[in-house]
From Swiss-Prot:
Protein name: Phosphomethylpyrimidine synthase
Role: Catalyzes the synthesis of the hydroxymethylpyrimidine phosphate (HMP-P) moiety of thiamine from aminoimidazole ribotide (AIR) in a radical S-adenosyl-L-methionine (SAM)-dependent reaction.
Lineage: Bacteria, Pseudomonadati, Pseudomonadota, Alphaproteobacteria, Hyphomicrobiales
Gene3D superfamilies: 6.10.250.620, Radical SAM ThiC family, central domain
EC number(s) from the headed UniProt entry: 4.1.99.17
Family: Belongs to the ThiC family.
Organism encoding this protein: Bradyrhizobium sp. (strain BTAi1 / ATCC BAA-1182)
Length: 633
């Protein structure tokens, strides 16, 4: 690999080890017992008197104490054997790494190169390569078996309450089954309603599925900029994001060392990695959109395909004829990729090369099974611009491109807005399903108001929960730094947790069979004052415990039947437990009735006597009533 690097640069340091009171477990599917599908088991206290709780896990080997993490070597490349077993691929030398791939960075500022090099694979003509092609042929791949086991959380049969949960939810036409089988996964992919983003060169990947009939997924964006960040920080942010629940990660780097940063991330990522190739292509022509060419973009696509990127955001729906539709907008074109292509189209007065070369783009991506994430380059960047003609014209074009990509054998999902007030969100979901043949929808929020810079993880979390309920398959997180700056690792965690809440709330509302298990387990822990279980069952045990410890830090407080909100005398749950305990001491049901009835009658008689004593008037002097009440206390 002819990459210049600075030998003084340090290797990335990442967070490892299990989450509190958790352990990594692995499920083995009946149809492929050699597979090890990761889950996280939350270990409950003995006082719980119930089994430990398995939950979906995105953290990869980083939370498995039995695995030695070597970021310099990367994660185990388990999927290569699956790909070779299917056949239809070839190993080849691949393109040389060029100085412009890393922004022509000088040796003094070059990041340390990832040393381990593996020759890339590509599909052979006339052979099935993509998960879509295998699914249409009726073939269930190991990736399909893997994700079915993962969605079921290792269960071998449906939950007893699965049918009731489905009936209780409102799925808006989604067809969530009581139990996920590999055949169901295959059929959803064959219909284009779900994708497994899994480049054949991302051998470190733990496969996952995106589709509205599966668990709602979330994406975390990372990436450097020309102003700040480094390879070390971005690898750390990737590992940090998946620790807290990011299902996929997008590397949106726009600064130096783009190729090297991406290589480090991919070789150490167990989750799908997405990119926006136009960003790197723009860096290769010194940031001037007018100088972009199809040849340069094509070379960038192949470069990233060979590295193992799992999905590309491609803004092929930004057409010359739509650009004028944005002229009356409050915030114009806010997508970076959309604005780049709009400027190119206007400068050359030509149709976008992403649109005119779309067939060829499909052919390239198919050879590596890279999924499309058809970008919404004309998404609204303000509430005022939501659902306008520019936005929906592009969406209609994305529907046309989806069908072309499907015909070519490529997997597709569709990107969505943006900034949309609550009452305009559902029409976005409905129109996307109609125009794009139910291809998975992947939205940025949407943000439901524009008035809260610094809190846009909340403004967008509201919209994300809603559109997830309506059928959006994956939600792209927004951090508190949105519109303000590049997020650091704390912002990444806040964004991920916010969007895990939104995704889970959507799954509950849809009636997903397993969604409520964790809620119920936490509610039981809360009612029984099992504080440690309550912390550990939450999405962020560390923060929950730290908030509790701010006022009740002693270990004895972890078994106390109250918290600092209400104290021991006013805790509603403690009072309810006292009532239950009292009722339990009265074994004879008739005695309970007599006792309660007698208590009520005595109280009524006492108040009647008091009323007469004070003169029998409807309206009494307030001070006299207060004085009289003292005698009753």
């Amino acid at each position: 690999m002819n990459i210049r690097s600075n030998p003084d640069t340090t290797l990335p340091a990442v967070t490892t080890g299990p989450l509190p009171s958790s352990r990594k477990i692995y499920a083995a599917p009946d149809s492929a017992p050699d597979l090890r599908v990761p889950l996280r088991e939350i270990i409950l206290s003995e006082a719980a008197g119930e089994p430990n709780l398995p939950v979906y896990d995105t953290s990869g080997p980083y939370t498995d104490p039995s695995v030695t993490i070597d970021v310099n070597a990367g994660l185990p490349r388990n999927r290569t054997a699956w790909v070779l077993e299917r056949g239809g691929v070839e190993e080849y030398e691949g393109r040389d790494i060029k100085p412009e791939d890393n922004g022509n960075v000088g040796a003094d500022k070059a990041a340390k190169a990832f040393i381990a090099h593996h020759k890339p694979l590509r599909g052979l003509d006339g052979h099935k390569i993509t998960q879509l092609e295998f699914a249409r042929a009726g073939i269930i791949t190991k990736e399909m078996i893997y994700v079915a086991e993962r969605e079921n959380l290792g269960r071998k049969q449906q939950l007893e309450r699965a049918e009731a949960a489905l009936a209780d939810g409102e799925s808006f036409g989604a067809e969530v089954p009581a139990f996920i089988t590999p055949e169901f996964v295959r059929s959803e992919i064959a219909r284009g309603r779900a994708i497994i983003p899994c480049n054949i060169n991302h051998a470190e990947l733990e496969p996952m599925i995106i589709g509205r009939n599966f668990l709602t997924k979330i994406n975390a964006n990372i990436g450097n900029s020309a102003v700040t960040s480094s390879v070390e920080e971005e690898v750390d942010k990737m590992v940090w994001a998946i620790r807290w629940g990011a299902d996929t990660v997008m590397d949106l780097s726009t600064g130096r060392n783009i190729h090297t940063t991406r290589e480090w991330i991919l070789r150490n990522s167990p989750v799908p990695i997405g990119t926006v190739p136009i960003y790197q292509a723009l860096e290769k022509c010194n940031g001037d959109p007018v100088k972009l060419t199809w040849e340069l973009y094509k070379d960038t696509l192949i470069e990233q395909c060979e590295q193992g990127v799992d999905y590309f955001t491609i803004h092929a729906g930004v057409r010359l004829q739509y650009i004028h539709l944005t002229a009356s907008r409050v915030t114009g074109i806010v997508s970076r990729g959309g604005s780049i292509m709009a400027k190119w189209c206007l400068a050359h007065h030509k149709e976008s090369f992403l649109y005119t070369h779309f067939d060829e783009i499909c052919d390239i991506m198919r050879k590596y099974d890279v999924s499309f994430s058809l970008g919404d380059g004309l998404r609204p960047g303000s509430i005022a611009d939501a659902n306008d003609r520019a936005q929906f014209a592009e969406l209609e074009t994305l529907g046309e491109l989806t069908k072309i990509a499907w015909d070519k054998g490529c997997q597709v999902m569709i990107e969505g807005p943006g900034h949309v007030p609550m009452h305009k969100i559902k029409i976005n979901m409905d129109k996307q399903l109609k125009e794009c043949g139910e291809a998975p929808f992947y939205t940025l929020g949407p943000l439901t108001t524009d008035i809260a810079p610094g809190y846009d993880h909340i403004t967008s979390g509201i919209g994300a929960a809603m559109i997830g309920w309506f059928g959006c398959a994956m939600l792209c997180y927004v951090t508190p730094k949105e519109h303000l700056g590049l997020p650091d690792r704390n912002d990444v965690k806040t964004g991920v947790i916010t969007y895990k809440i939104a995704a889970h709330a959507a799954d509950l509302a849809k009636g997903h069979p397993a969604a409520q298990l964790r809620d119920d387990a936490l509610s039981r822990a809360r009612f029984e004052f099992r504080w440690t279980d309550q912390f550990n069952l939450g999405l962020d045990p560390d923060t929950a415990k730290s908030f509790h410890d701010e006022t009740l830090p002693k270990e004895a407080h972890k078994v106390a039947h109250f918290c600092s909100m209400c104290g021991p005398k006013f805790c509603s749950m403690k009072i309810t437990q006292d009532v239950r305990d009292y009722a339990a001491t009265l074994n004879d049901p008739t005695t309970v009735g007599v006792t309660i009835s007698g208590t009520i009658e005595d109280g009524m008689a006492q108040m009647s006597a008091k009323f007469k004593e004070m003169g029998g008037s409807v309206y009494l002097d307030a001070d006299k009533v207060k004085e009289s009440n003292k005698a009753l206390s």
